[in-house]
């Protein structure tokens, strides 16, 4: 669908899952294609005022601990291009250790916040199999005065 549909339908929010699929099948350098796509998406957000949530996969870690084992997510691990983090207003990382009994728990980490600059662990989420939703856990896992 084109930009006209965004205006016609008065779209307020778009979820794009995921960036790699958007550019797959195109010929050329992946990094340059991501740069171009991110610039166009940023322009779309500026022109229309929509909220755009974009999913980006991660590069493998350079440490002994990988993401499947709960490794901390960083901006530099976004796969493809630095334009992903440079053009975003906010970047969030989801961290989950699949090798533990608490496999249903996920940490939401703010990696970039253009407006306030506050980054760090935002909350811990727990997957509810009955509702198929994530709920924020009631037990705090961070100290707001030191983790932001």
What is the predicted role of each segment?
Residues 23-30:
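Conserved ATPase-coupling elements of RecA-like P-loop NTPase cores
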Residues 18:
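Walker B catalytic acidic pair
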Residues 1, 5-15, 28, 39-48, ...:
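C-terminal regions of RecA-like/P-loop NTPase motor modules
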Residues 21, 58:
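Short glycine-rich anion-binding loops that position phosphate/pyrophosphate groups of nucleotides
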Residues 51-57:
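Structural recognition of the conserved hydrophobic beta-strand(s) that form the central parallel beta-sheet
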Residues 34-37:
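…and closely analogous acidic/polar surface helices at protein-protein or active-site interfaces
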